[in-house]
Amino acid sequence: MKIPFDRWLGWPTLLLLLLGLWLLGSSLRDQRTVEAVPYSVFEQYLRDGQLTDVQVGDQVISARFTSPHDGKATVVAELVEPAMAERMSHYGVSYRRVRESNWLSQLLSWMAGPLLLLGFWYFMSRRIDGQQGGAGFLGIGRSHAKVYMEKSTGVRFDDVAGVDEAKAELQEIVDFLRDPKAHGRLGARMPKGVLLMGPTGTGKTLLARAVAGEAGVPFFSISGSEFIEMFVGVGAARVRDLFEQARAAAPAIIFIDELDALGKARGMGALVGGHDEREQTLNQLLVELDGFDPSVGVVLLAATNRPEILDPALLRAGRFDRQVLVDRPDRSGRRAILRVHAAKVRLAPDWDLDQVAAITVGFAGADLANLVNEAALVATRRRADAVTLADFTIAIERIVAGIEKKHGLLGEDEKRLVAYHELGHALTALALPSTDRVQKVSIVPHGIGALGYTLQRPSEDRHLQRRTELIDRLTVLLGGRAAEELVFGEPSTGAADDLARATGMARDMVLRFGMDEGLGPVAYADAPASPLVGLPAMPTLSERASPATAERIDAAVQALLGHARQRATEILRDNREMLDRTAAALMAQETLDEEALLALTAGLRAAGRPAAIRQVA
């Protein structure tokens, strides 16, 4: 086994080196400034009055020259006559007796300087050690990759559910690592790199560890941000060291998590003409990938949720040969993931796997794992013997709407305002044909700043939405504000988030989807943000659009929002009596589930298809 230099050999070697330098320096200094003479010569110097400050020891006598003597400042002689001290007054020289130190005190005096330097060095190294992830100052260029030998990852493909397509793609990598010759008999070579792309929480890192667990090979895991440091050249050195370690342990897997921290396209975020440390590290990674020999048995796996910002040179064939999408699971995938995580908790007989999978549309693997754990915590708080379906329902509400604020009670006026606002959303959603189911309406404060909420969950996985469906969603978003204006005559600040979401959706319809009849099927937005990140972003108008076109776009957005607001107002006005009756029930009970809400809104007048939208001139 190779012993790290700075861990076992560095400090003893450094100590001996400093001690040797100190002793050598002391010896050279003594040779330059001290003159050793016989006792007779020393006594002659005394007679001539050339000495002062005589120090008489047990075996040695020393003194300082009154003036420099051939560059020497001190003279030393071996004491021959013990009675020499008695004749000092005869020569008119002051003297004093000294006790000569033993070898231990001399050694300690010699080592004082080196020990101080060593202590300072050790202190600074520990500071850097903590900041640089454990490598220390002497090992700052070493890779910080965590190594999981053979099957010690503890993860197999059976532990990863809901991503069957991704597992099928990665199974080939496992087969190549297990038996390269059998799978290369037709001339096929093992891919050099596999890029796992997908939203956060979908199991990319877990998949990479499962590949290593299935193949039974060493697994080198490191984050892309761990390559970049404050010292120039450290990142490139760590890339080289990582690949050298992997080649020495081949067959092996290198896994770089959050590759976008390292592989961002060159030129992004740097000064014009600049060449920062990150780009130098990326260049070294490209060189290592080019130098990969497939027969060595080293595979590079990487994960990112920002593939659109990666350098094109990194994604070309011959580097990352295969790109695998790890997306959010569908209903059957969610069922499989829930089955894996639910096996770790005690479930009640009313547990319904299919029902929980149906109401968790859009949940990623990490979200489902958190849901099962949250449901178990809910059951634990009420001291139950098993986790029930109701516990899962409460857990979903906590995840989606936030934690209930038991001490954030509203006054009667605010409670009435919030009740009408939330029912404005709920009734418009019930009246429109293509909106998501309303599962619950509550005026109990939840989360950060939410005084109430209307919980809607889709009943099935949807990948496309028609124009009429988007207009219905706009109508539901503005239903709360429309209810406030209808009942109280003016809006409140509670609709701020609804307005922001509705405006973003309307701009998407006009700028990205070409859903305005006047502007036609033209995309006016710049390239959108990554669809894998999952963060809503307001679309930005392309610089190619003229000022006149920008005015028409603003008018189209205003027309969409105005039409949705008018439509919501008409729905609520047509069902005003039902709105008042349901609001009274909501204020009394504070929460209405789907069954109670449907009972209170029986006979609700449904809205028809949206009429043609006219832009404001």
Curated annotation (Swiss-Prot):
GO terms for cellular component: plasma membrane. Pfam families: AAA (PF00004), AAA_lid_3 (PF17862), FtsH_ext (PF06480), Peptidase_M41 (PF01434). Its EC number is 3.4.24.-. Residues 1-7, 124-617 are cytoplasmic. The keyword ATP-binding applies. It is found in: Cell inner membrane. Homohexamer. In the central section; belongs to the AAA ATPase family. HAMAP family: FtsH (MF_01458). This is ATP-dependent zinc metalloprotease FtsH. It comes from Methylibium petroleiphilum (strain ATCC BAA-1232 / LMG 22953 / PM1).
